[in-house]
């Protein structure tokens, strides 16, 4: 299987449907601007964290799409249904879709910290 690239319009439909969106950039990159509601799961934490993501399709993003493509491939290899946004968060923002600067107000930062703790306990 190969992870599928989706355009911003399709990504928006998935986002509205409640599919899980993960931003695989570093926490500092994530804080500079990310898709509203996206979980911050840096690429290097993804293999261990994949088991704990909700059982729904997963949409990955990064700055421009490169790391998101790798993340979607990893998720696909782990048996998950994964897609990545062509052009990443940059394309999402250029389309005028919701972007948050700083940590997510709904606790997504806490979810990121959970992934970091989970990874350190697995090492």
Task: Kindly give the residue locations of the regions a language model identified.
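Rhodanese-like catalytic fold shared by cysteine-dependent sulfurtransferases
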Residues: 1-20, 27-57, 64-123
